[in-house]
Regions:
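Terminal amphipathic alpha-helical/low-complexity segments used for targeting or macromolecular assembly
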Residues: 1-64
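Short secondary-structure boundary/capping segments
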Residues: 5-6, 57, 125, 131-132, ...
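Residue-level preference for alpha-helix termini and adjacent loops
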Residues: 13, 23, 60, 70-72, ...
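Short, electropositive, low-hydrophobicity segments enriched in small/polar residues
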Residues: 15, 99, 163-166
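Flexible, glycine/small-residue-enriched loop-and-beta-strand segment within the central core
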Residues: 71-82, 86-152
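Low-complexity basic/metal-binding stretches
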Residues: 144-168
Length: 168
């Protein structure tokens, strides 16, 4: 049986009753506390932003990438951010299901990348499952984004401006 962190990344249902759930919540709270600290950092102090983002992600944020605080995140370890990205202020990432952001990606203000959903069964609503979000190179996003893959598109207000469809 997979541990609870692997289950999240594999899209399996995770229940608060499972062994390891407390450790998951502990990690989430620790990440959110670091994000709170990040919210107090000046946007001009990218060195400190990068230090705190490294702590959140569990790996170094590329030097060529800019993140403007405040930045909200529940769990950063399964999140990867490429080179030359620009992430505007007030973005929210729910990263438990995994987020992959390619190179040269622009993410507008208040964008939400949400990888976690709840069970549709009302009797099991507290259980969650993750679905990965993959954003390929040179994408610009200005929406709330649920699990999917986006490539070479400009997303704004739930529409893809490149192909004029709700979904590519």
């Amino acid at each position: 049986m997979n541990d609870i962190f692997s289950k999240d990344l594999n899209g399996e249902m995770v229940s608060p009753d499972e062994p390891g759930y407390d450790a998951l919540i502990d990690d989430i709270f620790r990440t959110m506390e670091t994000a709170q600290e990040l919210a107090t950092v000046s946007i001009r102090d990218q060195k400190r932003v990068h230090e705190l983002m490294g702590k959140i992600l569990g790996k170094e944020l590329p030097e060529s990438t800019t993140v403007l605080p405040p930045f909200y995140i529940d769990y950063g370890k399964p999140v990867t951010i490429g080179e030359r990205c620009f992430i505007q202020q007030c973005c929210t990432f729910f990263g438990r299901g995994g987020i992959e952001i390619g190179h040269d990606v622009f993410i507008g203000p208040k964008v939400n990348l949400i990888t976690i959903n709840h069970d549709v069964d009302p009797d099991n609503r507290s259980a969650t499952y993750g679905r990965r979000i993959v954003i390929e190179d040179k994408v610009w996003i200005g929406i709330r984004h649920c699990p999917a893959r986006c490539k070479n598109r400009i997303w704004r207000n739930h529409w893809c401006w490149k192909c004029s469809y709700k979904r590519c």
